[in-house]
Amino acid sequence: MTANKGLKVLGVIAGLAIVVMAALPTILHSAGLHPTYEGPTYELPGQRALIITTSHGVLSEPGETDGPPTGVAASELTHPYYIFTDGGMSVDVASIAGGEVPIDPQTFFYAVRSPEDSRYLEDSVAQAKVANSIPIADVDINQYDVVFISGGWGAAYDLAQSPVLAEQVTAAYYGTRNPVIGGVCHGVLGLINAKDTDGNTLIEGRRMTGVSDKQVKELGIEVTPLHPETELRRVGAIYEKQTAFRDMFATLVVVDDEQRFVTGQNQNSGSEASHRMMQIIAERDSS
């Protein structure tokens, strides 16, 4: 092969690589990542939503403190935030420790970044709420009509481990505003230690979903201390899921029979879960 032909081949390869990289977001979206919500939307002016996130920002091995940066998955924060705000709701952001919420930097990678993620990166108001989140211990949970718990790998380290969060979920469930409580992906770990008035697990016997053990294994992130499918089954929830050739392209939203809990399987489920939560409130208020 002559030098000129070699350069031409390299040029073709480089061109193809650029085309594939440019098309990658569309390819992933078509495969099922961050599906476009096509259901009904609702307006809830004057009502309030609380989004709760992890405060843990390191993907560490058991017993270690160092590791790659992690935190909340961007879309699991941005999707509910903008769905609630666009529906006229006032939205607050809380976290286990308060202060700046760590957002997993990989979830802002161009190929997996959603339109809501891009909107957040230009939104100084939303960024200020995330930088100055309310400590979960300081939250007056009875001020909210919706309580949404975001996931991400960081959530595996501190949601279920927080007795204060468990108490807040219990208080929300029995509170005067009768809020709809939800979570997606690892966010559902924030529900597993909430108790009913008899001291039993609040979500026992309820239909729920969360990220599957299969997806955790496929992504190679098994070092986290808790896995939602395993934990939901352990506490007696009725676990449901959808599957795909890779579960990161699957999605499922489950509403429990009482219509008090709405859970989403993974990062693809935040939009539908948020809309379903608003739907329950809208229909309840109109009845």
Predicted regions and their residues:
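Extended, subdomain-level signal for the structured scaffold at the beginning of enzyme domains
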Residues: 2-178, 189-287
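Conserved, well-structured core segments that form or line functional sites
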Residues: 181
